Amino acid sequence: MSTLFIADLHLSVQEPAITAGFLHFIQREAIHADALYILGDLFESWIGDDDPEPLYRQIAAALKSLQQHGVPCYFIHGNRDFLLGKRFAVESGMTLLPEEKVVDLYGRKIVILHGDTLCTDDADYQHFRRRVHNPIIQKLFLWLPLRFRLRIAAYMRNQSQQNNSGKSQLIMDVNPHAVVETFERNSVSWMIHGHTHRPAVHTVELASTTAHRVVLGAWHVEGSMVKVTADKVELIKFPF
């Protein structure tokens, strides 16, 4: 019995090898799990559930196959695919979760999240995040014709790359105080997240216990997952 976690695949038509690796992962690994949790940035970008891109139909069908085999799939939005909505969730058989969720797995309580909310030192990004998560702004964006949304998304990706290239690596990582506060607010001693692309298992000293923060890796040249069983929590990398 095991539950799997992945994040930061950044699937796109420009990276067919990653798509192939994900489809293989679904067929060989996830289909045998108790559940699959995707902690954001499954896609490189998402401009609306009405985008007819064939890749998205392919991924939806692969995820739907999990549901058909009795494996539930849960999704937390990332900073790239925060507009993924109910229509795609139904098509793919995924259950959408809030940005922060406590799950009880085999007697172990774990808080799961994408991870960008922990990067509080990056004030510019947090300001941007608050803006684009405004429901009114999201609704206005989704009302635009698809061709305009594509242009806006391309522009924003370019701006993000330029902005990040000039930022300190420190401010793009998690803030230790935000990590501790998240542990304590949720009364847990385990955390799993992605976003930073810095796979590792960290120990965190809390007031009354030692906690563990597990960071998923991005799918660039290899896959990354966390496998939770009754006995342990493992961070695993694997070839596509």
Curated annotation (Swiss-Prot):
Keywords: Cell inner membrane, Cell membrane, Hydrolase, Lipid A biosynthesis, Lipid biosynthesis, Lipid metabolism, Manganese, Membrane, Metal-binding. It comes from the Bacteria. Mn(2+) 1 binds at D8, H10, D41, H197. GO terms for molecular function: manganese ion binding; UDP-2,3-diacylglucosamine hydrolase activity. Its main location: membrane. It is found in: Cell inner membrane. One of its GO terms (biological process) is lipid A biosynthetic process. Pathway: Glycolipid biosynthesis; lipid IV(A) biosynthesis; lipid IV(A) from (3R)-3-hydroxytetradecanoyl-[acyl-carrier-protein] and UDP-N-acetyl-alpha-D-glucosamine: step 4/6. Substrate binds at N79, R80, D122, S160, N164, K167, H195. CDD domains: MPP_YbbF-LpxH. It catalyses: UDP-2-N,3-O-bis[(3R)-3-hydroxytetradecanoyl]-alpha-D-glucosamine + H2O = 2-N,3-O-bis[(3R)-3-hydroxytetradecanoyl]-alpha-D-glucosaminyl 1-phosphate + UMP + 2 H(+). Its cofactor is Mn(2+). It is a peripheral membrane protein. Hydrolyzes the pyrophosphate bond of UDP-2,3-diacylglucosamine to yield 2,3-diacylglucosamine 1-phosphate (lipid X) and UMP by catalyzing the attack of water at the alpha-P atom. Involved in the biosynthesis of lipid A, a phosphorylated glycolipid that anchors the lipopolysaccharide to the outer membrane of the cell. Belongs to the LpxH family. This is UDP-2,3-diacylglucosamine hydrolase. The lineage of its organism: Bacteria, Pseudomonadati, Pseudomonadota, Gammaproteobacteria, Enterobacterales.
